[in-house]
Amino acid sequence: MRAFRSAANFGAASNIYRKSFTPASIASNRFVSARMSSIMTDNARPNTDKVVQDIADYIHDYKIDSSVAMETARLCFLDTLGCGLEGLKYQQCANIVGPVVPGTIVPNGTKVPGTDYQVDPVRGAFNIGTIIRWLDFNDCWLAAEWGHPSDNLGGILAVADWQTRSAKAGLEGKVFKVKDVLEGMIKAHEIQGGLAIENSFNRVGLDHVVLVKIASTAVVSGMLGLSREQTADAISQAFVDGQSLRTYRHAPNTMSRKSWAAGDATSRAVNLALLVKKGEGGMPSILTAKTWGFYDVLFGGKEFKFQRPYGSYVMENVLFKISFPAEFHAQTACESAMLLHEELKKLGKTSDDIASIKIRTQEAAMRIIDKKGPLHNYADRDHCIQYMVAIPLIHGRLTADDYTDEIASDPRIDALREKMECVEDKRFSEEYHAPDKRYIGNAIEITLKDGTVLDEIEVNYPIGHRQRREEGTPVLLEKFARHLRGRFPEGQVEKILAASNQDIVNMDIDEYVDLYVKKD
């Protein structure tokens, strides 16, 4: 401290002296010293991390034998493609898909459904992954980590289509049936969902698309014929690859990257698997390496935990977004709001007559979509529970168009948002994590300006939940048909619908994808 004080006599030069010894610098140096002191100097090659090896073993050894998983995968496949077609209606989405160099057509390349693009499989994975995620309307998995396992279809479909076209052209490849794609989806769902059940990546600031990258890499490695060891190498490459931060999903930085982050992740997965196929190796202790491994650098030094071995559990229990293009934690809140809109109509009232609104929800919703203040864009609005409740209360609907600037300019929306209070219901939070329930409950109670309190409406699980699968399947297929008709002429729609029944599993994947070519 004496040196610190005496330096004050040297005028401007002392400012430089003091800055170089700020507490932050000292803390940083101590951190570096501690980190350097723990560096491993033993260069003996360790065994492959068990987590990585288990995923590789699952890819190479597990046989899908669940009829429930296969039928759910068929529905998921159709729904995911339909969501992609709907996403293409939005110019911001259409602007970023296609080849990197306009006009490029890759012989025997991946065809992008809903377009006339034919691109390389890496770009194809980005294109397909982006369009299916754009509207936040594809499937969902909720646990310690959240996500949308059908995002992996970007890489799976891109590789299957390219490999099949290449094989039929007499080049290196393999003919894939739709059944193979569905089995790949089941495994990708299981890997992403299995890692998500007990491990919260969001709590360390990482986005859930890290799991898309891991799952897509594993499945695509198997599709490309990589050995068990190469598959483990590719998975390690996915773990070491720079991981996306969640900041683009949260205030004050919410923006459209959240809509193409999964496309980016699944395309990187394809690229990494192809690099390993060409001879690149891996890192056996990518997770557990001291100082430099994933656990120490990105996961707070904690190791992953697992609830169950890999099978077909996730696909069997996956959640479909059927009624609303809304962040899944708000799905049942939207359903409650729709029912309350009808109650208001019966009373001869409108949203203008509302004095206050209380929303009981889960802890996850409180953290992700409880949002105050101005909403700046589409991405902001579809991640705000107050906005997603206000629209049904005002209009009796919630569609993708309701997140646009035109609709959002209605002053009634923000006025209604100001009247809402969100509180966590511990039961909802507990049932959210319970493996035998996986509920996503919300409840809404409205008080009118005249003092009338409407009966609270509680919905524990949405129509896309496994508990309501029988009720939801016809509505899901209607959603698929509606999305087809929004993109193609009726004759083409009928051909796709005719091919999409349960016999679809026997079709070559390129022939099915050809049905989705958009001709101007």
Curated annotation (Swiss-Prot):
The organism's place on the tree of life at top rank: Eukaryota
Matching Pfam families: MmgE_PrpD_C, MmgE_PrpD_N
The protein's enzyme class: lyase
The keyword Lyase is annotated on this UniProt entry: yes
Activity regulation, short description: Several bivalent metal ions, such as nickel, copper, zinc, mercury, and lead, inhibit the activity to some extent. Inhibited by structural analogs such as citrate, cis-aconitate, isocitrate, 2-methylisocitrate, tricarballylate and fluorocitrate, but not by trans-aconitate or adipate.
Induction text: Slightly repressed by glucose.
UniProt KW keywords: Lyase, Mitochondrion, Transit peptide
Temperature and activity: Optimum temperature is 25-40 degrees Celsius.
Any single Gene Ontology cellular-component annotation: mitochondrion
Protein EC: 4.2.1.79
Single annotated GO MF: 2-methylcitrate dehydratase activity
Metabolic or biological pathway, per its Swiss-Prot or TrEMBL entry: Organic acid metabolism; propanoate degradation
Segment annotated as transit peptide: 1-37
Keyword Mitochondrion: yes
Subunit structure: Monomer.
Descriptive protein name: 2-methylcitrate dehydratase, mitochondrial
Organism encoding this protein: Yarrowia lipolytica (strain CLIB 122 / E 150)
Lineage, top ranks: Eukaryota, Fungi, Dikarya, Ascomycota, Saccharomycotina
